[in-house]
Design a protein with these regions (language model features):
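Structured core elements
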Residues: 177, 240, 271, 355-357, ...
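Short, aromatic- and glycine-rich surface loops/edge beta-strands on solvent-exposed regions
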Residues: 347-367, 435
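Short, compositionally biased P/S/T/A/G/V-rich stretches that sit at domain boundaries
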Residues: 243-263, 275-278, 363-418
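Intrinsically disordered, low-complexity transcriptional effector regions of transcription factors
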Residues: 314-316, 321-324, 332-339, 352-356, ...
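Short amphipathic beta-strand/extended segments with alternating polar/hydrophobic composition
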Residues: 164, 366-369, 446-450
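Contiguous segments within soluble domain cores/interaction surfaces
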Residues: 291-295, 299, 305-306, 379-381, ...
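Secreted, disulfide-rich extracellular signaling modules
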Residues: 1-348, 361, 377-378
Length: 450
């Protein structure tokens, strides 16, 4: 699983709450530079007349992400094409001494007009006023280059109500994690303009008013998330792009075809990695095209391919009836090609085989592998493995792409050798594993399992 985070590039809290004197509202206040974002709904705290809208106190979140960066990364191949990647909106709960509601739903909707972040900080008394300055609030959305003030059509923000995402908060303190893949793809594809997300309580839990007759007659106060200006690096609001980037290369764990396995399980998948001056590069004469892979037994000392091409098992995908002496290899990504095939063991099967990758008369690569024979067992095997990262460092740069080398062995393996000393201990190959990344000093989980 690959994860790439895109941190928010603008956020703000807008509110129409009463200030502490209960005589003036915060509709002109801006909180764009605050390190916390807040949403709530308060019922009848300042009921001063029969006008029902004076009962309403609301706070909503505006947040925007760099979709242009995501589009650029897709064009350069950093993230996959549409359909092969999911996007998740991640916001992290901010601890507070204030009350927190339970069993409420937050709704995420795309904002339909542009807005400015602003420089206000005051989330308590709402004293940082926009009042004609740059920034958005409950009424104003932006100030243009000519100095003109542009307001929302609807106080509290304008949203595309046809596209919304909900998350239920049972205990109230949960983080937000919402799959927003469909909307992100629409932004990337230009179906809608990217004006960010609006986050608020669901319509049934925001206070009842003339414009929301099905609203609640109770309070939900308050839910806070860390904003993009927070000092906590791992708790900044982000869009997470997630995709399956696994390359399961069977070169170190190949098997002869067996009736104990299904046809798909009998396939061994091998890869070719074309590194040129330290970087993966397509083979010039092949590009994104196809290669052929033939398998040979070894010479007497098993140091090189020898003899004729071996007959592979026909699967009608990689090996066809007309080409049982080679498997068709395909393009995976820049500089990486793969092929899959099954091979049947002879009465005295070779202990080492060689795979030759070629196109026409050009040979590009010769590799080797040691196939194993699959056997049934009279006992149930559930091995436990010990894993060591052999190249782990104390620290890494934030812009570093680190590759970890794992040494794997079974728990009950004994290194004691009585008959012959051997300085090379071979690692085990495991088919699947999960990992998480957490900070040791406080157990903060940066990446969870799965």
């Amino acid at each position: 699983m690959a994860i790439k985070k895109y941190i928010a590039n603008a956020d703000n809290t807008i509110s129409n709450a009463w200030q502490s004197n209960l005589t003036r509202r915060a509709t002109g206040s801006n909180m764009g530079a605050a390190d916390v974002l807040e949403t709530y709904s308060v019922y009848a705290r300042a009921y001063t007349s029969s006008a029902e809208n004076k009962q309403v106190e609301l706070s909503r979140i505006l947040i925007k992400f760099p979709v242009d960066d995501i589009t650029s990364d897709r064009s350069s191949g950093i993230i996959p094409a549409s359909g092969n990647v999911n996007f998740y909106l991640k916001l992290y709960n901010a601890e507070t001494s204030k009350t927190v509601p339970e069993r409420y739903t937050l709704t995420v909707q795309p904002v339909s007009q542009s807005w400015q972040e602003g420089t206000g900080l005051d989330l308590e008394n709402y004293l940082d006023y926009t009042v004609g300055n740059t920034g958005s609030d409950w009424v104003q959305r932006t100030k243009d280059d000519a100095g003109a003030i542009l307001n929302w059509v609807n106080a509290g923000g304008d949203y595309l109500t046809a596209s919304n995402y909900d998350q239920l908060f049972e205990g109230g303190l949960e983080n937000m994690e919402v799959d927003v893949t469909i909307l992100m793809e629409e932004w990337i594809g230009g179906v809608y303009s990217n004006y960010g997300f609006g986050i608020a309580l669901s319509a049934s839990q925001e206070i009842t008013a003339s414009y929301n007759l099905t609203g609640a007659a109770t309070s939900y106060y308050t839910k806070r998330f860390f904003g993009r200006g927070t000092q906590y690096y791992f708790k900044r609001p982000a869009i997470e792009a997630r995709w399956d980037s696994r390359i399961k290369d069977d070169r170190g764990n190949t098997f002869y075809s067996s009736s104990l396995s299904t046809a798909s399980e009998n396939l061994n998948t091998l890869y070719l990695y074309n590194y040129v001056r330290g970087g993966l590069t397509n083979i010039p004469d092949v590009g994104t095209g196809l290669l052929k892979v033939s398998v040979y037994s070894g010479s007497i000392d098993n140091s090189a391919p020898s003899g004729s091409k071996m007959t592979l098992v026909q699967d009608d995908t990689y090996v066809t009836a007309d080409s049982v002496e080679y498997a068709t290899a395909g393009y995976v990504s820049t500089g990486i090609y793969s092929c899959s095939f099954a091979v049947t063991a002879s009465k005295t099967p070779p202990t080492r085989m060689f795979d030759v990758w070629y196109s026409g008369s050009n040979r590009y690569f010769t590799g080797s592998f040691k196939p194993q024979t699959l056997e049934a067992s009279q006992i149930s095997l559930r091995p436990t493995y010990y894993i060591n990262i052999s190249n782990l460092k104390q620290s890494y740069r934030s812009d570093e792409n680190a590759r970890f080398n794992l040494f794997v062995r079974e728990k009950n393996w004994s290194p004691t050798i009585y008959t012959k000393a051997n300085g090379l201990v071979e690692t085990e190959t495991i088919e699947s594993a999960s990992y998480r990344v957490y900070r040791q000093i406080d157990a903060l989980e940066a990446i969870s399992y799965g």
